[in-house]
């Protein structure tokens, strides 16, 4: 029986550094098998519930395709497709679905919801995203970084994350860096730094793994020598418009553009983004942002960077599939 069998995947700190590497190795193997057409199905006969309280493209598609590739079946429960938290408690929903399904994915709001599902379902529960953490995204990020710097181990890599570092991506990057011993720089105005107690706890773990976690407002200092630059959207569509103006004004200096890439001093620096990205005006929201806030070349990242050879965002997006598949296979297959 493998070490992950019947375990949950709720946040990265539930795992050891060696276990994170093992999941990445499994994802690499599964990706290779899929590309070569020799993938072995280990989840035949399994049924999976996908609970989405927030809309999704990459996460939903990754879970569905990964399940189909492995011979499993899925039921999609969208934002209006279940009674969870409305007419039925999370606890009761967990106990019902746990009787019918072999695994449950949850993408929604509070971390406490996915933790309650895990406590009462009796089957593996996976966190597809909460307000606090996005662990499946970080597995894909780490796999992508390994692929693009094959001669460097993760504990020798440097990543700078620019923008609003208080969100689920900032939190999960802190956990990932602490676990694998990476040099992580969070580059943002102090108003957008993560909770201090959480940062201190991750820094303490990083000291044990050989990692380094730095928070700075200085862009040049933060990106110097970085192997990877990472950013995410500055505003969420559920937030009031008043917040947009304040946030964009605050974060505009932290836009990832060619000047910032040059400040790394690394001509081979790569750009990461968990997507979707506001890099042009080809979407309704993107056009609105460009016109209203004078951002013709993109918001958190410019079109020039996004479409450049530095950008590996679509490799990163593809790797959501392979890493999510690894999590499902590891937690639902005995072998």
Swiss-Prot record:
Name of the featured protein: Ornithine carbamoyltransferase
Single GO MF annotation: ornithine carbamoyltransferase activity
Gene name of this polypeptide: argI
Catalytic class of the enzyme: transferase
Top-level taxonomy: Bacteria, Pseudomonadati, Pseudomonadota, Gammaproteobacteria, Enterobacterales
GO cellular component, one term: cytoplasm
Enzyme Commission (EC) number: 2.1.3.3
Species, as recorded: Yersinia pseudotuberculosis serotype O:1b (strain IP 31758)
Positions with a binding annotation for L-ornithine: 168, 232, 236-237
Function: Reversibly catalyzes the transfer of the carbamoyl group from carbamoyl phosphate (CP) to the N(epsilon) atom of ornithine (ORN) to produce L-citrulline.
Family indicated by similarity: Belongs to the aspartate/ornithine carbamoyltransferase superfamily. OTCase family.
BP terms from Gene Ontology: arginine biosynthetic process via ornithine; citrulline biosynthetic process; L-arginine biosynthetic process
């Amino acid at each position: 029986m493998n070490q992950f069998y019947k375990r949950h995947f709720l946040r990265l700190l539930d795992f050891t550094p060696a276990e994170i590497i093992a999941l990445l190795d499994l994802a690499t193997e599964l990706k290779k098998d899929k590309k070569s057409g020799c993938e072995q199905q280990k989840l035949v006969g399994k049924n999976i519930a996908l609970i989405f309280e927030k809309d999704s493209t990459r996460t939903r598609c990754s879970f569905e395709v990964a399940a189909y590739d492995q011979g499993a079946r899925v039921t999609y429960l969208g934002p209006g497709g279940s009674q969870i938290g409305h007419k039925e408690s999370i606890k009761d929903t967990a106990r019902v679905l746990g009787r019918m399904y072999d695994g449950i994915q949850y993408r929604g709001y509070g971390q406490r919801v996915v933790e309650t599902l895990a406590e009462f379902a009796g089957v593996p529960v996976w966190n597809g995203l909460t307000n606090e953490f996005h662990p499946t995204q970080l597995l894909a990020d780490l796999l992508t970084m390994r692929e693009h710097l094959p001669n460097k181990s993760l504990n020798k890599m440097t990543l700078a994350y620019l923008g609003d570092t208080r969100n689920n991506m900032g939190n999960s990057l802190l956990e990932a860096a602490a676990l694998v011993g990476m040099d992580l720089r969070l580059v943002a105005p102090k108003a957008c730094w993560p909770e201090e107690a959480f940062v201190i706890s991750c820094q303490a773990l990083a000291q044990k793994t050989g990692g380094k976690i730095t928070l700075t407002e200085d862009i040049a200092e933060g990106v110097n020598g970085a192997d990877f630059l990472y950013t995410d959207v500055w505003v969420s569509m559920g937030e009031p418009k008043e917040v947009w103006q304040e946030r964009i004004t605050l974060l505009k200096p932290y836009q990832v553009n060619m000047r910032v890439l040059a400040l790394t001093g690394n001509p081979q620096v790569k750009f990461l983004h968990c997507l979707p990205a506001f890099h042009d005006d080809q979407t309704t929201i993107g056009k609105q942002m460009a016109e209203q806030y004078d951002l013709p070349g993109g918001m958190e990242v410019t079109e020039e960077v996004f479409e450049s050879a530095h950008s590996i965002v679509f490799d990163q997006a593809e790797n959501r599939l392979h890493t999510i598949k690894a999590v499902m296979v590891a937690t639902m297959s005995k072998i």
